[in-house]
Amino acid sequence: MLIVRLVFIFILLCTQSLAEINISHAIAMHGHPKYDNNFKNVDYVNPKATKGGKVVFSVIGSYDTFNPFTLKGDSVAGIGNLFETLTTSSSDEAFTEYGLLAETIEWPEDRSWVAFNLRKDAKWHDGKSVTPEDVIWTFNTFYWTEL
């Protein structure tokens, strides 16, 4: 009988902990994300806009690094347009992040941790898949080294 009770308590604890985990395409600091997981474009973008062609930007100033994350020096303006991140924000709501390389985001109610589940089609410029090890390496590089 004691074993049955212990198993029952274990199942209840596991069920409770699973119920408290949020899994979503986006995470909002307050309330819920504006856009659901099937949105095709944000409200402030014209989905019928002309696509393709060439765009040229000019910038006044100089740079001494291609690393946009460094605290030392000045990075190239617009360098962030060359890569994707785990999440991205929208310009019409504050404090919400939508999965970009991340297909889903998981977090507990107390927000003590966060997990990102990568899209299967997330690729580097050379066609190789982005792996969890790549994300971990990037995080550790930013967190543990002086850029």
Language-model-derived ranges and their functions:
Residues 1-9:
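Sec-dependent signal peptide recognition
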Residues 14-20:
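Sec/Tat signal peptide C-region and signal peptidase I cleavage site
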Residues 20-110, 117, 140, 147:
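N-terminal lobe/hinge region of extracytoplasmic solute-binding protein
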Residues 56, 131-138:
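Alpha-helical secondary-structure segments
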Residues 93, 123-124:
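Glycine-/small-residue-rich active-site loops that bind phosphorylated ligands and cofactors
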Residues 116-122:
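A structural micro-motif recognizing beta-strand termini
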